Amino acid sequence: MITLKEKRVFKKSALLLAAIMTLFTLSAFSAFAAKITAPQVTALTAAKSMTDSVTIEWKVKGKVTGYRIYSYNTKTKKYTRLRTQKKTQYTVKDLTAGESYVIAVRPYYEKGGKEYKGSYFKKTVYTTIDTVTGIKQKTTEANRHKLAWTKVSGADGYEVRYYDENAAKYVDVGTVKTNSCTLSKLKSASVYKYKIRAFSIASNGKKICSKFSSAFSAVTGAPDVTGFKQTSTGKNSYKLTWKAAENAQGYYLFRYSNETGDYERIAILNQTSYKVSGKQSAERDTYQLRSYATVKGKRVFGKTVTLEAATKPEAPEISLSSELLYNGKAKLLWNEVEDADGYFIYVSSKPDSGFTLKKEISRSDLTTATLTGLGKSKTLYFKIKAYVEVGDGYVTSDYSNTESALNFTL
């Protein structure tokens, strides 16, 4: 038989056991509940970037059922779901080259009919831009040349670099917006190496650059010829001369042929002069001259310069209609000079010096002229030259004979 005291002890023991069991149950439940936490992405990287796509990869902490991938609009602050998947890699496609995009990944875990969502993990990624190809040299001059290349889709501009031999590295030349550029202030008959890359400015302001192109070599032409002129002119010959062009190996000389209607090469020269002989008086010719040099095993040329040249025309014979002049007025006559373009008439108050041009006759068949306003000198002297027009100047004959007359002023 259980005594009252024993009943009391038993009751206390039962209550204590119940309390212990309740505490254990609550502790076990709390421990279990604490383990069910939302998974979190700990790292997100752009594993591969292309011109129209970006492949992202990420790492996660915690148990995961799947992932939701979003694009994030920085202006509207809104997420747009792209895909739900279980893999930790995703390729975002149909993108624009050279642009920035914000991609977010949000993991989730499902348990007991509930979904535990992690935080959005955002990452700004960038598409690439194509490498420049198709570089060509469009023009070649002594101190500059023009390069052009295939236009890169999405490019906002291009960076150009050239190889500096002294610095032994590529240095910046400049930036252009179009797919061509002209490089100037270069050394003639030389080789220059270039690399070019495209760039775009993303919507977030970041500059995205392509890889540099393969090295491209361009050349400059031979130096341009200057000072091309005719000298030592006679009735049957003359000399063509010009200034020596730095870095030139030689010169090509051409003469226009009326028979073929084109220029024909008459000489390849190392010197800076060429004598023309065996001509008739007042015979005209047109010449072209250009320098050359050899660069990278290829012959390059300078600009072509043109010169019109002629031998002297025959000197005319003149006479006066009268040996007496009245009130500074005189009439001159002379013979027509074959192939001349006109005549210059000169007057002086001295027989051997001081002759000045008084009048030009611009017709070869006009062989008379009346001069007025000759002044009050007692004796006046007259000479004439025939001329041939060449380019912007003249080739004149020797002076004619000298005629004189007394000048009477009434």
Describe the predicted segments one by one.
Residues 4-17:
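Bacterial N-terminal signal peptides that target proteins for export
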Residues 24-38:
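Sec-dependent signal peptide cleavage junction
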Residues 34-62, 97, 115-154, 188, ...:
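Pro/Thr/Ser/Gly-rich low-complexity, intrinsically disordered linker/stalk tracts
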Residues 44-47, 82, 104, 135-138, ...:
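Tandem-repeat architecture and repeat-register "anchor" residues
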Residues 62, 73-77, 111-113, 153, ...:
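Solvent-exposed strand-loop boundary residues in beta-sheet-rich modules
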Residues 65-68, 156-158, 249-252, 285, ...:
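Short beta-strand/loop motifs in extracellular/secreted proteins, especially
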Residues 68-96, 159-187, 252-280, 344-376:
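Recognizes extended acidic, P/S/T-rich segments that occur
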Residues 92-111, 183-203, 276-297, 371-392:
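Beta-strand-rich modules
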